[in-house]
């Protein structure tokens, strides 16, 4: 007999399959419901424009890369990275690996080829342990790495959209993002679950 699911996992499964955005993604043949978060950000903030170079961190299963590729329709470059495998997407150059490792980071930077990126996207999140303090520290480490990637690859005037979990370290990170970009907004997309602490920082006009 299989292991009995916990009350919390049963609740998550019910929420997941009752979720209108999960159902909408399935009907449209999309890779994940996360695409609707980026779609809403794009409608409000106009981050992505044809002809740009976009880096997608934490890309698997590919919802955001798929959205950008469809938007570009061949006019633009997308470089994606994730520790998990991702089915190929036309127009997306995908690197599988953990970019916290030096060799993977070097390979990713080589593909990017210098400070010529218009937009860095990050929907990264750690594997949750259930320990809130540990999970928050891990998630803040990932967003700090994403900001460091901006410093290495973004053009002046470039943009950054990053998922952040509110909690310890959030205000300090927000201050760092504001120091690097002239305009920073906090977004809570409609498709983000209400009880989730996740928000998205949308930063434009990179100045460093």
UniProtKB/Swiss-Prot annotation:
Positions annotated as active site in the UniProt record: 163 (proton acceptor)
Predominant place of localization: cytoplasm
UniProt xrefs under SUPFAM superfamilies: S-adenosyl-L-methionine-dependent methyltransferases
Record-linked Pfam families: FtsJ
Positions bound to S-adenosyl-L-methionine: 62, 64, 82, 98, 123
Role according to the record: Specifically methylates the uridine in position 2552 of 23S rRNA at the 2'-O position of the ribose in the fully assembled 50S ribosomal subunit.
Protein name: Ribosomal RNA large subunit methyltransferase E
Lineage: Bacteria, Pseudomonadati, Pseudomonadota, Gammaproteobacteria, Alteromonadales
